[in-house]
Curated annotation (Swiss-Prot):
Pfam family, one: FliE
Keyword rRNA processing: no
Protein name listed in UniProt: Flagellar hook-basal body complex protein FliE
Keyword RNA-binding tagged: no
MF-aspect GO terms: cytoskeletal motor activity; structural molecule activity
Localization (cell): Bacterial flagellum basal body
Keyword set, alphabetical order: Bacterial flagellum
Organism for this UniProt entry: Burkholderia cenocepacia (strain ATCC BAA-245 / DSM 16553 / LMG 16656 / NCTC 13227 / J2315 / CF5610) (Burkholderia cepacia (strain J2315))
Entry's Gene Ontology cellular component terms: bacterial-type flagellum basal body
Primary location recorded for the protein, binned into one broad class: other
GO biological process: bacterial-type flagellum-dependent cell motility
Similarity annotation: Belongs to the FliE family.
Record InterPro entries: FliE
Signal peptide: none
């Protein structure tokens, strides 16, 4: 969850720097890319990858527990399976909403006149 929060924080920081550059009248697009946006691109990409890996890991763990419960593993209870499935679902929905916000922000930026 901490990786998700830090990932969102980096997205917000990048969006704020883009807004500041847009309102400040950056001379050229290459100057904007050479600024802080390019420096945080690696950080943003690594945060997104870490978030997606965690979501995938949670889903794989929940599916593994469900399969173990189905075959009758004695140390897995139905409560554990249900809680882990819901955690994986919430993580997936969170990732989906982050993706939707990023796509929406991208579309807004692309529709801006130069």
């Amino acid at each position: 969850m901490t990786a998700n929060v830090s990932g969102i924080g980096s997205v917000l920081q990048q969006m704020q720097s883009m807004a500041a550059q847009a309102s400040g009248g950056v001379a050229s697009p290459t100057a904007a890319l050479a600024g802080s946006g390019a420096a945080t691109a690696g950080t943003f990409a690594s945060a997104m990858k870490a978030s997606l890996d965690k979501i995938s890991g949670d889903q794989q763990h929940a599916l593994g527990e469900a399969k173990a419960f189905e075959v009758g593993a004695p140390n897995i209870s139905l409560n554990d399976v249900m809680v882990d499935m819901q955690k994986a679902n919430i993580g997936f929905q969170f990732g989906l909403q982050v993706r939707n916000k990023l796509v929406s922000a991208y579309n807004d930026i692309m529709q801006m006149s130069v």
